[in-house]
């Protein structure tokens, strides 16, 4: 939902009323429906992005339009059905991102004439449609907020790509700003620590180990200069210092690998399996790279990896929720946005 925070009116050189500032929260994406058709549309858009799959040659296109889009959508649809928000008929990521947008609008209501909206890089609501909506409402300045604490070309950069692609079709473009990654922001680290501590206090057991699981990516992308791995490590180290834990008690792993290439290691699922086989009975997993709970946290971690842990001898497993639209999570986003809006409001 678009939320407008009103103040006075002004006029642009073209004569239209344009004094508003747009803030667009952007997350990765979600299918419109939890079925094979919905997943096929979503995955085709996602996996056709050269920022996500860099080798977009003939071999990849044949594989994508052949085996992948004829098999993977059915499997992923079953996973989405396990976590689907049936009341609103949408994925949890969409529900949470909308809530983040609404709460941000309320939190910055005293800071001028701002329009807060939200979009998905893949799927709906699209960045194209929401940027058009913001400019139609008179926004001549636009702050794009990629909801990724750690930068990667496959996430933050493709948000920028799409924003400039949309602006490239406009004659009268809004002025554009993009928020930076916030992987080591003290407010973000503190919010993570408080969230973890509160969750652990609610459990009936004390985890022997906490695992910080981040979305993985091909090792080749890091070798080309992507800073993602270093930023994940920096987040984890800052969190260790904040919580007084060493690397044996707060472990860094990477999940969601896809395909046959080597991805960032250690792999989350393999580490979960090894810990259980080595005698660890109580494990908690936090996912600091996700600003909102989604398929990768609610199904892959909370269900798949919990089953791996128990199947191999583990007993107690808990997936720690993302910051989502919690007060501490929203405070991180609010401060980030207000910092980048300086001079505009």
UniProtKB/Swiss-Prot annotation:
<dbReference type="InterPro" id="IPR033659">
    <property type="entry name" value="Ferrochelatase_N"/>
</dbReference>
<feature type="binding site">
    <location>
        <position position="296"/>
    </location>
    <ligand>
        <name>Fe cation</name>
    </ligand>
</feature>
<dbReference type="GO" id="GO:0005737">
    <property type="term" value="C:cytoplasm"/>
</dbReference>
<keyword id="KW-0479">Metal-binding</keyword>
<dbReference type="GO" id="GO:0006783">
    <property type="term" value="P:heme biosynthetic process"/>
</dbReference>
<dbReference type="GO" id="GO:0046872">
    <property type="term" value="F:metal ion binding"/>
</dbReference>
<protein>
    <recommendedName>
        <fullName>Ferrochelatase</fullName>
        <ecNumber>4.98.1.1</ecNumber>
    </recommendedName>
</protein>
<dbReference type="InterPro" id="IPR033644">
    <property type="entry name" value="Ferrochelatase_C"/>
</dbReference>
<dbReference type="InterPro" id="IPR001015">
    <property type="entry name" value="Ferrochelatase"/>
</dbReference>
<comment type="pathway">
    <text>Porphyrin-containing compound metabolism; protoheme biosynthesis; protoheme from protoporphyrin-IX: step 1/1.</text>
</comment>
<comment type="similarity">
    <text>Belongs to the ferrochelatase family.</text>
</comment>
<keyword id="KW-0627">Porphyrin biosynthesis</keyword>
<keyword id="KW-0963">Cytoplasm</keyword>
<comment type="function">
    <text>Catalyzes the ferrous insertion into protoporphyrin IX.</text>
</comment>
<keyword id="KW-0350">Heme biosynthesis</keyword>
<dbReference type="InterPro" id="IPR019772">
    <property type="entry name" value="Ferrochelatase_AS"/>
</dbReference>
<keyword id="KW-0456">Lyase</keyword>
<keyword id="KW-0408">Iron</keyword>
<dbReference type="Pfam" id="PF00762">
    <property type="entry name" value="Ferrochelatase"/>
</dbReference>
<feature type="binding site">
    <location>
        <position position="215"/>
    </location>
    <ligand>
        <name>Fe cation</name>
    </ligand>
</feature>
<dbReference type="GO" id="GO:0004325">
    <property type="term" value="F:ferrochelatase activity"/>
</dbReference>
